[in-house]
Amino acid sequence: MSNGIVAKRYAVALFKIAKEKHVLEMFEEELRLVQNVYEKNGELHSFLTQPNISKEQKKTFLANVFGSVSESILNTLYILIDNKRIDILSDIANEYVVLANEERNVADATVYSTRLLSEEEKLNIAEAFAKRTGKDAIRVKNVVDEDLLGGIKVRIGNRIYDGSLQGKLARIQRELMKNR
């Protein structure tokens, strides 16, 4: 079975537990924290994937590092260690966020711009795209892209809204070529 399918199953199980306990936000925050630490700490990743280190040592280590997370999240980490699937941790976290966002009618947007946007600009973008997409809210993550000439690009899920100067020039060029 592919890692994506397995990750989705774990995410669905966590989502059901979170929904039952009314802790969608908390689980999301904890999963993002665990994912962040796991992805950014090469030593942790290396330790957890070492075959010569016992499962019990790995679990004890996880309990020490992530002792502040909920029992359900910690137990999931233990199961991943037992099943030698800790490598799909990031996929599980990402799948969980998708499920939680769908439940709350929220979307995550990545906004590419030539400079960092102010909080007010992010709020305006979030409001505009919430209306456009029919979502209750949009969570904006700003990424500076120095390759843009001007304007912004917004990515929500697998959809890109291109309001960049490059995009506008490309559309004008296509129109001119079409009208020849």
Curated annotation (Swiss-Prot):
InterPro entries: ATP_synth_OSCP/delta_N_sf, ATPase_OSCP/d_CS, ATPase_OSCP/dsu. Keywords: ATP synthesis, Cell membrane, CF(1), Hydrogen ion transport, Ion transport, Membrane, Transport. It comes from the Bacteria. One of its GO terms (molecular function) is proton-transporting ATP synthase activity, rotational mechanism. GO terms for cellular component: plasma membrane; proton-transporting ATP synthase complex. The keyword Membrane applies. It is found in: Cell membrane. It is a peripheral membrane protein. It holds the Pfam family OSCP. F-type ATPases have 2 components, F(1) - the catalytic core - and F(0) - the membrane proton channel. F(1) has five subunits: alpha(3), beta(3), gamma(1), delta(1), epsilon(1). F(0) has three main subunits: a(1), b(2) and c(10-14). The alpha and beta chains form an alternating ring which encloses part of the gamma chain. F(1) is attached to F(0) by a central stalk formed by the gamma and epsilon chains, while a peripheral stalk is formed by the delta and b chains. F(1)F(0) ATP synthase produces ATP from ADP in the presence of a proton or sodium gradient. F-type ATPases consist of two structural domains, F(1) containing the extramembraneous catalytic core and F(0) containing the membrane proton channel, linked together by a central stalk and a peripheral stalk. During catalysis, ATP synthesis in the catalytic domain of F(1) is coupled via a rotary mechanism of the central stalk subunits to proton translocation. This is ATP synthase subunit delta. It comes from Bacillus anthracis. The gene is atpH.
